[in-house]
Amino acid sequence: MTDTIKIGVGGPVGAGKTQLIEKIVKRLAKDMSIGVITNDIYTKEDEKILVNSGVLPEDRIIGVETGGCPHTAIREDASMNFAAIDELKERNDDIELIFIESGGDNLAATFSPELVDFSIYIIDVAQGEKIPRKGGQGMIKSDFFVINKTDLAPYVGASLDRMAEDTKVFRGNRPFTFTNLKTDEGLDEVIQWIEQDVFLKGLA
């Protein structure tokens, strides 16, 4: 069975987690065997969105209904997600990469290191310029940080320069990028991180 890398994607409700995964998978799936696990509290809405997008066959997408606090299912008791990983591998024994999308949660949510190998945390500009200044373990500890919906900055009075400065304070040299996933702006940086830092490509 192929060794499988697992990337967790976390962030508040509406930040763009599902859309980010959809965009990444669309770019990588032609060269890589991929699966996706989504977490929702009482529905499988994000699973339906990905299935309807057509980026992957339906048997490569599993929706998990956590039935409780979203971060519990990705950290304190990740048993449902571990079971979903096993099921994806049974369905497709060639899977190289699995994305695990958390349910929308607060800035403190992080993935168990036993569940994922790497993590992405995404927020959006519309939540306010001050969000990076608030810190939060999701933003601080993630391997890659995404600030989405840059096109909304003028409408909410947010300075992207200030958000970048604040992000550098708590992340140091760890990577982050701005995105507008409606136009794919910034998506190349996310893909490059996956290919080079996660899969160690392009380092020869």
Swiss-Prot record:
TM annotation in the entry: none
Keywords assigned by UniProt, alphabetized: Chaperone, Cytoplasm, GTP-binding, Nickel insertion, Nucleotide-binding
Name of the protein described by the UniProt record: Urease accessory protein UreG
Molecular functions (GO terms): GTP binding; GTPase activity; nickel cation binding
Domain of life the protein comes from: Bacteria
InterPro entries tied to this protein: CobW/HypB/UreG_nucleotide-bd (IPR003495), P-loop_NTPase (IPR027417), UreG (IPR004400)
Binding site for GTP: 11-18
Organism name: Staphylococcus saprophyticus subsp. saprophyticus (strain ATCC 15305 / DSM 20229 / NCIMB 8711 / NCTC 7292 / S-41)
CDD domains (alphabetical): UreG
Database matches in Pfam families: cobW
GO BP of this protein: urea catabolic process
